[in-house]
């Protein structure tokens, strides 16, 4: 009986040996691709881990707390009775405010797994022997569901109950217990779940902006006058020639770190500290714009330069999550505001300090809507940076001779009495 060619075991075996099957080729190719991906992932993780490890991560339990009497004199900014702006309260009125604040304990803190809250802190200190006051506090909330990033400035003079210490200005919390105490105070006060913070002092902020290559800022004549005074003061502390940094007048400038930080610190032009918080948010927004323009190599170098300057308690897994989502987050809608909101607070004079007392129920409701709701907010910017320009006596006393009569007339400056 005859047998077909392909029925011959020997011939069939030789036929199969002519070359590898497409399945084997695909299998080998996939293994190679997988190996490359894994190797690349390991490399990226290793580089990323080294970068993240270079930051100044401080676990909450390692942050020391101090008593108020241990703080240096500069920690408390007192205001004389003659210069006060707040109402002097009798004991019953102050107790009523405390009772209203105590009722906040009945309000639930909002938690949402689709919202990430991070507190950005700008620290004011002349030496490293203490934590410093939190001169700038911005609550950054990333809402992945609404695809919105809200940046809300929390004014430093807000009257709050600091856990374990009692009633004081909000910025005193950082001086007493660093980032952990500040975030705890904000969580208890505003009923927003925030446990993570990232802090830089002014000297580090200067380095960050310089590493970025500077940022574009538009300033008025009056803002330049005041910023120049801050530049001279900071340069004196840093051992720099301040006159290499001062600006000639109002306009749009590509500012280096000293110039940008001096602009952000200004609370003497416009509506006092309200306008300053707007300037601080303006600086942050310009930093973000510069970061958006960077290519991969520039961004990598910037991250290497900046991370060691930041003190924070953000876990590495959270940083990786933010990094991987960064391209998407940068496309989100950005909104900004500040607390206290317009027409929703009072100013009182307590313990030789002017304090801001928000209408807490409506303030918390509005903040929660900004972060977790539809995000509809009323922009306070117009009221923060009014066209009228005011420069207080406090500034002219600190920097005599910077404001001459001609400049005062041209800029429309009103010296407060």
Q: Would you name each region that the model predicts?
A:
Residues 113-116, 132-137, 146-154, 165-167, ...:
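Extracytoplasmic
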Residues 80-108, 114-116, 127, 162, ...:
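C-terminal solvent-exposed extensions
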Residues 172-240, 313-315, 319:
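Amphipathic, coiled-coil-like alpha-helical scaffolding segments used for oligomerization/assembly
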Residues 141-144, 159, 175, 187-191, ...:
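Sec-exported extracytoplasmic/periplasmic mature domains
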